């Protein structure tokens, strides 16, 4: 991000680790690989473990935010081509629908994807630039479809309206140039941050991202949670920069887990 407004705002915080105060929002991760170890078959023990994690968060005075995907692909999904295959998006959406039904009575706030841009540009073993854009396009499409699916599922079950968004990893522009935008990670800052943000928040797919599911423009996120490591000054800078790109509410991710 090149520029950010100078105005300081109070930014809602979302904790990926243990929150220091009661009433804070905390991410509860739902590990897809454990919840659906075989295609179409749920693992009852894993489902119960996530349910218990949500209940513990509530009992401790927290507000649980269920994260549906943080990079843990089931082996069977990877064997089918993973995020490179458009037809596989239905597998992810089937899992999302099941999660919304299983856990919807315990939370009304969701994160669809945790740092999808980081997963594609820094953690993916695939070094082909075109295939990386394909993965990111499919994840953005899956996010939008997941938002609609969760909203519809909750409406059918007469549950409270949901708030659903995604977590995006962001860096000041100088950090991107020094680290990410070199060698095998030769993407532009726009490709890393701006393209996924616009596609997932607004359904605005700019080239080279492809709108493979013909997503209509609209409001496809109630919030965007910005993560940026442990440097508070840089993280706040990125939050303000993200706010210049969309009218969507911006949250700040506080992550005190071990360095990932």
Q: Whereabouts are the PLM-identified features?
A:
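Non-catalytic scaffold segments within catalytic domains of secreted glycoside hydrolases
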Residues: 1-23, 34-223, 227-232, 236-240, ...
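Conserved nucleotide-binding/hydrolysis modules and their immediate coupling elements
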Residues: 246
